[in-house]
Swiss-Prot record:
Name this protein carries in UniProt: DNA repair protein RecO
Family: Belongs to the RecO family.
Alphabetically ordered keywords of this record: DNA damage, DNA recombination, DNA repair
Record function comment: Involved in DNA repair and RecF pathway recombination.
Gene3D superfamilies per the UniProt record, alphabetical: Nucleic acid-binding proteins (2.40.50.140), Recombination protein O, C-terminal domain (1.20.1440.120)
Stored NCBIfam families: reco
Short name of any one Pfam family annotated for the protein: RecO_C
Alphabetical list of HAMAP family matching this protein: RecO
Listed GO biological process terms: DNA recombination; double-strand break repair
InterPro entries: ARFGAP/RecO, DNA_rep/recomb_RecO_N, NA-bd_OB-fold, RecO, RecO_C
Chain ranges passing through the membrane: none
Gene: recO
Length: 242
């Protein structure tokens, strides 16, 4: 049965937005609580009433990493999911790539404010899943998504010039990255990274093991700062499985 068309002039009803499921959990006896990342409305929370009994007919497609078309109604923090259908074939993530996918989902839930449309980030997320599924370059997929997410929430990194002098970043120089300002020439800081790593982050190309290692360490510190010390369950799950 096709989804019910929205009533004219009713802003509380949304018809067929592209989406991905970020998280689901059981609610009461028959329903599901869902976190969705949508193309036109950003991250939203919805309730799928009766979905666990199969009354809605779309519970089977509500799986992570499956492109969806969803319709919902209602105002406030929790809307009612009226319709969901697969908009394509979901990517198949295995082993390390699966934990990377969970990591992307958790970052969206923790850092992206609700109801904040980010169509470019949506495209980056979709492309990141495809890269993870292909097993081509997990590190580049993760760093690219982290950078795009920080830009989307207003905390993009300064990766072109030194924060204090305004001079171009030098590949051979060591820098300490100040989260509230940008890169400054480093002294004996333990978290210093080479300028070539900052430029690799700017270009989203990591051609050496050094740039990969330093970029991962720097981004982990910056992400941890914006998480305010909250641990990521996806990382804990990966460690426990290793």
């Amino acid at each position: 049965m096709p989804p019910e068309a929205p009533r004219r002039g009713d802003p509380s009803r949304v018809l067929l937005d592209h989406a991905y499921l970020l998280h689901r959990r059981d609610y009461r006896e028959t329903s599901l609580l869902l976190e969705l990342f949508t193309l036109r409305h950003g991250r939203i929370g919805v309730i799928a009433k009766g979905a666990r009994r199969g009354r809605q007919g779309f519970a089977a497609v509500l799986q992570p990493f499956v492109p969806l078309l969803v319709s919902w109604s209602g105002r406030g923090e929790l809307a009612n999911l009226n319709h969901a259908e697969a908009a394509g074939i979901g990517v198949r993530l295995q082993h390390t790539a699966l934990f990377c996918g969970f990591y992307l989902n958790e970052l969206l839930m923790r850092l992206l404010p609700p109801h904040d449309p980010c169509p470019e980030l949506f495209g980056t997320y979709r492309g990141g899943l495809e890269t993870l599924a292909a097993g081509e370059d997990l590190e580049t997929a993760l760093r690219s998504f982290e950078l795009s997410l920080l830009e989307a929430i207003g905390y993009g990194l300064q990766l072109r010039v030194e924060a204090e002098s305004g001079e171009a970043i030098r590949p051979e120089r060591l820098y300490s990255y100040r989260i509230d300002a940008g890169p400054v020439p480093a002294g004996d800081e333990a978290d210093a990274v080479h300028g070539m790593t900052l430029l690799a982050l700017r270009d989203r190309r990591f051609d050496t093991s050094q740039t990969r290692t330093e970029a991962k360490r720097l981004m982990r510190r910056i992400i941890a700062h914006h998480l305010n010390g909250r641990a990521l369950k996806s990382r804990e799950l990966f460690r426990s499985s290793s």
